[in-house]
């Protein structure tokens, strides 16, 4: 216990509120995938169709898309592939486990983390592209070099995280040839281009230091 007359009372109370928020976030994290799969099974959401299309793509010869020279072209491709990774893992888990998936909480958490990182990556990408278009040229980085750098850093970091979540989820429910195929798919869909992250982080930090505050 603690005394309400003590200044520490406010700190204890605020800390307790933060724990409530964190608990709610964890519950929502578990419910994210469960809700998507339930809607898919009820026919309210076409999840299996795209998932099967991704599975068919894995069985085919990898295509060699034309290079996208537009602003953040590589990152656009990466985000599109993140979505394929989510569909592959979620669809595979749903087909293998069915309604039993609800009992596999670690697998659900890995898929939920994939969904969350993919959502954030796309949000960051679209926000940066919108800023560029507001400047009158969606292909220009003039005046927003740091924003582009932060977008690249986030999406490239997300690729490693999503790959990790995908591998752990697949290893939890698949085996044999299916496991090998899905692990190869995870590696393929989470592939990132070579990026000098040290220089990009220095670029962002230099701007913040010069401004003396968070300036984005």
Where does each model-flagged region fall?
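Flavin-dependent oxidoreductase catalytic core characteristic
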Residues: 1-216
């Amino acid at each position: 216990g603690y005394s309400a007359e003590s200044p520490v009372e406010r700190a204890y109370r605020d800390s307790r509120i933060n724990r409530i928020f964190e608990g709610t976030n964890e519950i929502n994290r578990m419910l994210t995938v469960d809700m998507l799969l339930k809607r898919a099974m009820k026919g309210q959401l076409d999840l299996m169709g795209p998932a099967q299309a991704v599975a068919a793509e894995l069985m085919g010869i990898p295509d060699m898309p034309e290079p996208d020279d537009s602003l953040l072209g590589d990152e656009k491709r990466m985000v599109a592939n993140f979505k394929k990774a989510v569909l592959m893992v979620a669809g595979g888990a749903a087909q293998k486990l069915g309604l039993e998936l609800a009992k596999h909480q670690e697998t659900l958490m890995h898929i939920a983390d994939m969904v969350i990182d993919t959502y954030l990556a796309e949000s960051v990408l679209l926000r940066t592209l919108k800023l560029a278009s507001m400047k009158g040229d969606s292909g220009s980085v003039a005046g927003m070099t740091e924003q582009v750098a932060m977008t690249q850093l986030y999406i490239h970091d997300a690729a490693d995280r999503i790959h990790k979540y995908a591998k752990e989820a697949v290893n939890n429910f698949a085996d044999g040839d299916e496991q090998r195929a899905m692990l190869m798919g995870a590696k393929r869909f989470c592939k990132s281009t070579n990026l000098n992250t040290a220089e990009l982080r220095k670029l962002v930090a230099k701007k913040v230091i010069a401004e003396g505050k968070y300036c984005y």
